[in-house]
Amino acid sequence: MPEGVSQDLLEKLKKNTTAEIFYDNFTRGRYSTDASIYQMMPHGVLIPKTKSDIVETINFAREAKIPLLARGGGTSQCGQTVNQAIVIDNSKFLNKILHFDKEKMICIVEPGIVLDELNRFLKPYKLWFPVDVSTSSRATIGGMAGNNSCGGRSIRYGMMRDNVIGIEAILHDGSTYNFENLELKNLKVNDGIAPKIISNLLKLALKNKQEILAKFPKVLRRVGGYNIDALLPDAMASRPNGKVGDGINLSHLLVGSEGTLAYSTSVTLKLSPLPAQKIMGICHFPSFYEAMDAAQHIVKLDPIAVELVDDTMLRLARDIDMFKPTVEAVVKGNPKSLLLVEFAEDNMDENLSRLRKLHDLIGSLGYSWKGDVKKFGGVVDVISNELQSKVSEMRKSGLNIMMSMKNEAKPVSFVEDCAVELKDLAAYTDGLNKIFDKYETKGTWYAHASVGCLHVRPVLNMKLQDDVSKMRNIADEASELVKKYGGSFSGEHGDGIVRSEFNEVMFGKKMIDIFRVIKTSFDPDNIFNPGKIIDAPKMDSRNLFRYAPGYSSDNISTILDWSIWPGQAGGFQGAIEMCNNNGTCRKLEGGVMCPSFRVTRDEKDSTRGRANSLRLALSGQLGKEALTSDEMNETMSLCVSCKACKRECPTGVDMAKMKLEVSSLRTKKYGLNLHEKLIAYLPDYASFASKFPSLFNLRDKIPGASKLSEVFLGFTAKRPLPKWRKDFFKNSELPDSLELNHSQLPVILFVDTFSRYFEPENVRSAINVLKAAGYFPFLPSSNKSSRPLCCGRTYLSNGLIDKAKFEGEKLLSTFLPYLKEGVPVVGLEPSCILSFRDELPSLIKDPNIDLLKNNSFTFEELLSNNCKKINFKKMNEKVLLHGHCHQKAFDAVKPIQKVLNMIKGLEVELIDTSCCGMAGAFGYNKKTYDVSIKMAQEKLFPAISKTKSGTTIIADGTSCRCQIKDGINRDAVHLAQFLDKNIIY
């Protein structure tokens, strides 16, 4: 524990609150970083359940002289949410909507509510909260208020300051005060400390009015320092959508204060009508400078947003599976810069009219798809809502896309959101690029061209002192450049550690003295997030860096291939460090990632939380042998290896693969318990068990047997185990070699252990369907063992990597003669067949492994390209389709839809679900059964329950089918079975 903060002290606090309190190294480590370059180990972590928990904690901190740090999503890029303090995480419990008034268009929310969650609630009422930040899927309203966040549509709606109308906050003495419009307050100086503070600060603002007006930048996007200008008479009149007579809103002093003045417990928000129609025009430019110069003309068309994307971001996005189709759909040629221009008027005709004017404007500036290559450019229209959403999502992921560079040098946030007036934007960006050139680096540019606030991050290696010195010099010169143009050194992301020291440069010493009066008036004991805005450390203090001097990782021996990343442990270090802490894995809707976090809301159970624990463990910051510790095992325990992060994390953090590596280390050290052995060695004893199915099925027939298996074997008694089948699939049912038949296409049908012994009807149906499609399915036998071939999935899942490697090599050698002839391999179980394209190539060093990787297909992938010979029955039916997590991770759900759409009259509804929660043995484990069911209850079970009982459910994963049957007693079938029943033979 840190000096002066004992476990006994925190235990005392724990007894006086209902909060969850942690002070172990793993938890503290997970909260030691945000999305900035900094790392500060907190004293402990407190997760409050009630407002009284916070009051008690503030009183405790004041008396014990321990700092406090309020935290939401932890996505700050400037170091606002790291400190040597007790971190209070609002996001798990304090996330409710307290009041909503549709007519007045206001709502009151707790600080931990996520922006996207709020807007999902508001959507049916045709309202939204319009401060649409790029991290909206995990950013909390409390964090956004503390930061004075802005978002891409601030040209129309303004910043948080312009959309917050009240804050209830707890002050340093534990008292509560409602900060709202001054006209609603009766400032009796004897009525608590707040009125006295406010009265004094109102006088301070009025006394220094000329200094404030002279020193505060005139740009819309200014979030540096304290908003003392909000206390000037009629301050709101100068804000977007403000008018004379709006007066002073006291809450605006707390907005942007970064949790340094008080602790917000609720925020009152001004809502806006949800745009009924939207349309987008993507302007292409042959140079970055020309795009910047055009922005000032485009905003005259009154768009809702003008967002920049540069060629570096486009190049990186093309290499990310999730974004590649979007880039290909909307980008014409090879532009150096794009401006994404969005119109959102109530009338679609008006939107189309403005889009035409945009075409005319770009044409009048000399850009054309024909003629002079120096002026090659124009506008690509994006009309469909679906494609607009994909483009917006790509832009929102700008930071993560930039951070996907697989090298030690990364784009670094420290001058990333300076704001200048539009007329100066081209000159300012040109000047900053010259500074980058001077220090032999380059910046990646994107974001808010409409308001002169572009995001740019020079590429530097924060592990090298030379690059840290470059960062210092660039920051110094950039601050002077911004000051030259009368801009703001921070136009969106705030001060934190990285910019607080520059407030004196930007505002002057007298204004800093005023800021200090504000801080000490509210927080005389300096317990609220000290060292931010005023009295901050130097931004280049390397002892505060995530990669501090002396940082290094253990060069452990790894089994999997991590060679495309830099660093120790064969690149394992670099793969872990790809996590930039931006927290996309904390999203609660859309896609799959991260199913465990969606259920528990614990940072430990997010991909980010696990990656941080791995980084700290590998670098020795969590003690010796932390990688194989019980704490690391607990950290990984709820990871279901869904592979969603492999696809959905923009920086490509593959936690499923990392878990395999760590599991291998632990298994080598401690071995497996009986439960784990029964799972891992299933392929070894399955052929024996299949001879006595009645015996092995007794567990679910004899009263009390399931409970005994729970106690002694670890299998939950709350669900039955899969039934061993006496009619299991035998290899003799398929030819074991390729027969000459020129009218049929040969294909190896890989029969996995699960399908073979528990659902053989799927294999038999697949054979029928493949033959109907013109294929000749066969299964080569192995000369090395009488036991059927196996993909090694159960061994992988339990850390027996060497055993899995042996199985993979045996499979490769058996299939290799046919693979060399171009014969494809097809499988029915997604987690098995897709391991041929994922885990096995990372495990097996044989160069021939690429033949297996590139020629292995799921059942539907194979059929989607060769299904025309099949004569399907005409149907008048609706089916529900649930995609297996691994199918989603490899974009292999679309082929199922393509095949099903060949059946006339069939309506296919793809269920929007995350993970089913079964995850192989995960749902059978007594320790994880409850979490397994909760995962399914998030989306899967409700979606199915809404349909008629006779509706066909198609799910290719055996785990998915078992979960659906066990959880809500509905039958689901494999695609092969469904097709087999609906083919005219």
Where are these regions (language model features)?
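N-terminal flexible segment immediately upstream of the FAD-binding catalytic core
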Residues: M1-E63, G73-M105, S134, Y157, ...
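Ferredoxin-type iron-sulfur electron-transfer modules and their immediate structural context
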Residues: L10, E408-A409, K484-F489, G496-L638, ...
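N-terminal glycine-rich flavin-associated loop
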Residues: L13, S36-L68, N90-V133, A145, ...
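A glycine-rich phosphate-binding loop feature that marks nucleotide/adenosyl-phosphate handling sites
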Residues: T27, S76-G79, T135-G142, L220-L231, ...
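C-terminal substrate-binding/cap subdomain adjacent to the FAD-binding core in PCMH-type
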Residues: S36, G146, S154-M160, V164-E393, ...
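Flexible inter-domain linker/hinge segments
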Residues: E117, V189-R239, K243-D246, F522-P595, ...
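Terminal amphipathic helices with adjacent charged low-complexity linkers/tails
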Residues: V267-S272, M292-A295, K300-A409, G443, ...
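Iron-sulfur cluster-binding electron-transfer modules in prokaryotic oxidoreductases
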Residues: D523, P530, A656-Y985
